[in-house]
C-alpha cells in the first residue's frame, strides 16, 4: 500500500468519525486539531495515538512511507495534522536539521539552510497541501486572515513562520519562511564554543553586565543579534524588575528566566506610542526593546535611557553603528520634531556600547562578533565620539582590540569599583595580546558639519 493510500484510508476514517460527532464534540475536536498543528505536545500525542490505532485496525501497518519520516504513523500525522515534509526540520529529527536555522518553502520546493548553504530537500509539498497548511495555521491565529497575503505566526516551540501568498507572489510560487533558534544553551560559554566570541570576551561581557551599561545589539538580518541579547539578558541579575517590549512574541522570557520579574509586552507603531507615557511612569530597573525599527521605538528607548536608567538593551538592524545615532535622530525628529543635535547627543551619552554581529561570508550559519563600539559624549566640548574597541579579522578568524574607557563609563563604574577594575584589566590584556594599531576614534561629522574642515578627525 502506498503512503498516499494509507493517508487517504486514515482520512476517510477520521472524516467518518467527524460526521458522526455532535456539535459540541466537533468544536472540541477542532480546538484540539488547532493545538496539534501548533505543536502542543498533549494534543499531538493524542492524534498520533488515534492514527496509530486506525492503522492497526485497518491492517495497513506495512504501508510505505517517505524516508524523511521516522515511522508510518508519524508521516500520516504530519500529512494530516502536522507540517507535512517540514516536520523533520521543525522538530530537529536529524543532525543536519538541528544545525539548520531557517527553511523556505517556495512553491512546492523546500530549501533548508544547512551549514550556511541553502540546500534543496527531497520532500515537496503540493499546492493543495500548502493551502491546507496555511488555513490550518491561520485557524489557530484568528487575527490573521487568509486573504491578507502576509502573515506572521509562531509555533509552540518558538519557530516563526512568515507566509507570503495571493497577489504578493507569482502564480504557484507562494512562499512560507520558517526561522528557529538552534542555540540550546544561552550562555557566553556556548558562544565561545561556537566561535562567536573568544574566551576572554566572555569574561569581559560578564563584567560589563555586572556594571550595568546600556547596550545596543546591531547587525543585518540573521546575524545573531537576538540570540546574543538573550545570552546577555540571561546573565542579568534576577532580583531586578524588567520590561521586555517586542513587535512580536519571539522571545519567551518567562521560559528563559522564570525566576526574574520580567514583564512582556507586544506592541508596535501606534500601539507603542499610546503606551509610552504609562511605560515611562513604571518602576522598572531596565527595559528590553527587541527589533527597534521605527520612530516610536527609537523615541521610547531614548526616553527611557534619558531618565538615567541602566542595564537597558535593544536590538536594531544596521551594518553601520557609527551612523546609527543619525538614523535614529532623523526618524525621531521627522515624526515628533525636536533638535537633531540634541537627540544625537542623548543617544551618544545614553547608550554605552554597541555589540555588532555578523555572519561569516563563507558560511552564513556561522555567527561572529564583528565589532564592539563605545559611544562617548564629552559635555565640556559638546563632542560625541565612537571608539572601535574590538574588530573581527575575517581572514584570520580572530579579534583585535584597543583599550578605551570614556569618562562617562568610569562614572557609571563607580557603583561597582571592583568590576570596573576587572573590566579595564581584561581590556588591556586583550589589547596587549592582539592590538589594533591605528587610531580608531570617530567624531561623526553629521553632529557638527564644521568638523569637515578637519576631515581626518572624523574617520568618515
Model regions: which residues?
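N-terminal accessory targeting/assembly segments
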Residues: 1-144
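Phosphate-binding glycine-rich loops and their immediate beta-loop-alpha structural context
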Residues: 189-264
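P-loop NTP-binding catalytic core
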Residues: 99-211
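NTP-binding/hydrolysis catalytic cores, primarily Walker-type P-loop NTPases
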Residues: 368-460
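Conserved RecA-like P-loop NTPase ATPase core
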Residues: 163, 205, 247, 287, ...
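Switch/coupling sub-region of P-loop NTPases
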Residues: 231-348, 357-359
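An exposure/low-complexity boundary signal
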Residues: 167-188, 224-249, 447-459
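Phosphate-binding/switch region of NTP-binding enzymes
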Residues: 343-379
Amino acid at each position: 500500500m502506498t503512503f498516499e493510500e494509507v493517508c487517504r484510508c486514515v482520512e476517510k476514517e477520521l472524516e467518518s468519525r467527524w460526521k458522526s460527532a455532535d456539535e459540541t464534540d466537533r468544536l472540541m475536536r477542532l480546538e484540539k486539531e488547532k493545538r496539534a498543528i501548533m505543536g502542543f505536545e498533549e494534543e499531538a500525542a493524542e492524534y498520533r495515538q488515534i492514527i496509530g490505532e486506525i492503522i492497526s485496525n485497518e491492517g495497513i501497518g506495512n504501508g510505505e512511507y517517505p524516508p524523511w519520516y521516522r515511522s508510518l504513523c508519524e508521516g500520516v500525522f504530519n500529512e494530516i495534522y502536522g507540517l507535512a515534509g517540514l516536520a523533520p526540520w521543525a522538530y530537529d529529527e536529524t543532525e543536519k536539521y538541528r544545525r539548520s536555522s531557517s527553511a523556505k518553502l517556495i512553491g512546492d520546493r523546500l530549501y533548508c539552510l544547512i551549514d550556511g548553504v541553502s540546500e534543496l530537500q527531497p520532500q515537496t509539498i503540493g499546492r493543495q497541501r500548502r493551502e491546507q497548511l496555511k488555513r490550518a495555521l491561520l485557524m489557530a491565529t484568528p487575527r490573521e486572515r487568509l486573504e491578507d497575503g502576509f502573515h506572521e505566526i509562531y509555533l509552540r516551540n518558538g519557530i516563526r513562520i512568515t507566509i507570503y501568498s495571493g497577489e504578493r507572489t507569482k502564480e504557484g510560487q507562494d512562499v512560507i519562511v520558517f526561522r528557529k533558534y538552534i542555540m540550546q544553551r544561552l550562555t557566553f560559554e556556548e558562544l565561545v564554543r561556537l566561535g562567536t566570541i573568544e574566551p576572554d570576551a566572555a569574561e569581559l561581557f560578564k563584567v560589563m553586565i555586572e556594571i550595568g551599561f546600556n547596550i545596543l545589539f546591531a547587525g543585518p538580518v540573521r546575524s545573531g543579534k537576538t540570540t546574543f541579547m538573550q545570552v546577555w539578558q540571561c546573565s542579568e541579575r534576577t532580583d531586578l524588575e524588567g520590561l521586555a517590549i517586542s513587535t512580536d512574541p519571539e522571545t519567551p522570557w518567562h521560559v528563559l528566566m522564570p525566576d526574574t520579574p520580567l514583564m512582556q509586552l507586544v506592541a508596535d507603531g501606534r500601539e507603542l506610542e499610546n503606551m509610552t507615557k504609562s511605560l515611562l511612569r513604571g518602576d522598572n530597573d531596565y527595559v528590553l526593546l527587541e527589533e527597534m525599527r521605527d520612530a516610536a521605538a527609537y523615541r521610547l528607548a531614548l526616553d527611557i535611557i534619558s531618565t538615567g536608567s541602566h542595564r537597558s538593551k535593544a536590538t536594531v538592524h544596521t551594518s553601520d553603528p557609527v551612523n546609527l545615532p543619525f538614523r535614529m535622530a532623523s526618524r525621531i525628529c521627522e515624526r515628533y520634531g525636536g533638535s537633531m543635535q540634541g537627540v544625537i547627543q542623548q543617544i551618544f551619552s545614553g547608550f554605552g556600547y554597541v555589540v555588532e554581529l555578523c555572519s561569516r561570508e563563507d558560511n552564513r550559519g556561522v555567527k561572529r562578533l564583528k565589532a564592539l563600539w563605545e559611544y562617548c559624549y564629552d559635555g565640556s566640548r559638546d563632542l560625541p565620539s565612537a571608539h572601535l574597541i574590538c574588530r573581527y579579522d575575517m581572514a584570520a578568524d580572530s579579534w583585535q582590540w584597543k583599550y578605551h574607557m570614556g569618562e562617562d563609563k568610569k562614572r557609571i563604574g563607580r557603583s561597582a569599583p571592583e568590576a570596573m577594575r576587572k573590566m579595564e584589566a581584561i581590556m588591556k590584556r586583550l589589547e596587549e595580546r592582539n592590538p589594533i594599531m591605528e587610531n580608531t576614534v570617530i567624531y561623526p561629522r553629521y553632529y557638527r558639519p564644521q568638523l569637515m574642515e578637519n576631515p581626518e578627525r572624523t574617520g568618515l
